[in-house]
């Protein structure tokens, strides 16, 4: 909480956007767009073409094509376009999901099951690349934020 006060004193604003859900916020983080632009506007949304409810954090198949659902370029795609490699990491169970394909598109996804594994992979990535973009997602940190309802 002390950091929030320090930021306030320096007029630094941190905003996860609205709605403040993991799905919307992560898509905004990786695209630089607000939910109304990237299309992931909440945890669950009804697909207007099929009427099916889509839970953004579950697998979307066969109802939604991730490339069509989330159309904004990601930071990883922008980096790749100028020759900069990208890495994204999360739990192994996220590999190949619609959300991973939509939000981390353009990055090489590596599934990991521990923070040690993430940091080892991160170190290897930067040992092999002079520059790059890397994103690490650790769900326990996300869950802690939700459970403490820290504002």
Predicted features by range, described:
Residues 2-132, 137-146:
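His/Asp/Glu-rich, glycine-adjacent segments
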Residues 147-151:
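Short, intrinsically disordered, charge-balanced linker/junction segments flanking boundaries
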């Amino acid at each position: 909480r002390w950091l929030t006060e320090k930021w306030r004193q320096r007029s630094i604003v941190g905003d996860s956007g609205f709605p403040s859900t993991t799905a919307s916020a992560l898509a905004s983080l990786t695209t630089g767009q607000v939910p109304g632009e990237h299309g992931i506007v909440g945890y669950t949304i009804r697909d207007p073409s099929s009427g099916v409810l889509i839970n953004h954090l579950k697998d979307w198949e066969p109802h939604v094509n991730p490339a069509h659902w989330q159309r904004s370029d990601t930071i990883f795609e922008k980096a790749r376009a100028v020759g900069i490699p990208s890495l994204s990491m999360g739990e192994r169970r996220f590999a190949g999901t619609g959300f991973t394909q939509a939000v981390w598109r353009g990055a090489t996804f590596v599934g990991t099951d521990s923070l040690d594994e993430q940091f080892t992979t991160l170190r290897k990535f930067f040992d092999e690349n002079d520059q790059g973009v890397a994103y690490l997602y650790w769900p326990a940190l996300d869950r802690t934020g939700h459970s403490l309802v820290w504002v």
